[in-house]
């Protein structure tokens, strides 16, 4: 069967570069990037060998369009057949799923110390299946999202370790909405492009996070 379209997931895979992809002929070539914030300089070169660029972040989409590429925003968590509202009783006050690295734990500990009940899954051995996670989201009043990148620094090909972190658009925002649950999120410019404050309440500090959580739990 003739192959017409080839997708290349290029992040942190140096061999899938401009020279490798450029040798592939007579197909439509699509570059896919999820962590473009860390490797944009290299990806922007690789993109020159592709026909279309798909980005997890709308900011990256604009960066590629600025360079003349045909680029589109493609959030990977947008399948409503997978992430759906089970209409379960909202018995969990606040849910966080993911790794408790960097200052995430400080934020959550601050909430707990101030009387907020937080359920945590997905850290260390506390894993759940995708179906279990979706049902947990459905039965939660609030999902908590953090936007900072997880590494100690953002290491990319041009800037080395100059930046301590980037604010990323995370999938929890979309997953939560599809499951019928409010997501309260740390600030990121990507989500600011898509959602307003009423759709995704945003915080920058621990005190702001606590105030927003209390406000919505009381309503």
Each language-model region and where it sits:
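Catalytic binding pocket for nucleotide-activated donors in carbohydrate/polymer assembly enzymes
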Residues: 1, 58, 66-68, 127-219
